[in-house]
């Protein structure tokens, strides 16, 4: 994923948290804010409680891959995806199913 697709600054995270809407299921919480831009941006938060760095980075890679596969539906939004406890036990298909489920609840896809 290109760096232009990532939310990095604390200011951007705080703006999404304060002005954006949020949706959750058992495995993910998604904060989203509609923006006028040509592509989506995502920030991913995985707690240290979910595992060591290898496990957390694997979860982040899977989340990025799912979001890139839904790229056309997610235009014009900034996201913060927070992984909840239990995500570390999911394989890719289950993680994808849960993440798409929460995106559908939000009405984004």
Curated annotation (Swiss-Prot):
Primary gene name: rnpA
PANTHER family with a match to the protein in the record: RIBONUCLEASE P PROTEIN COMPONENT
PROSITE patterns assigned: RIBONUCLEASE_P
Top-level taxon: Bacteria
Keywords: Endonuclease, Hydrolase, Nuclease, RNA-binding, tRNA processing
Similarity field: Belongs to the RnpA family.
Alphabetical list of InterPro entries matching this protein: Ribosomal_Su5_D2-typ_SF, Ribsml_uS5_D2-typ_fold_subgr, RNase_P, RNase_P_CS
Enzyme class, broadest EC rank: hydrolase
Annotated protein name in UniProt: Ribonuclease P protein component
């Amino acid at each position: 994923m290109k760096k232009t697709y990532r939310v990095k600054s604390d200011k951007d995270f705080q703006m999404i948290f304060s002005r954006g809407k949020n949706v959750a299921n058992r495995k993910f919480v998604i904060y989203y804010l509609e923006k006028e831009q040509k592509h989506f941006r995502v920030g991913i938060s995985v707690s240290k409680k979910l595992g060591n760095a290898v496990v957390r980075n694997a979860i982040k890679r899977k989340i990025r891959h799912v979001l890139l596969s839904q790229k056309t539906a997610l235009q014009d939004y900034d996201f913060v995806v927070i992984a909840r406890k239990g995500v570390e036990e999911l394989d890719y298909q289950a993680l994808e199913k849960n993440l798409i489920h929460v995106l559908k609840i939000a009405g984004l896809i």
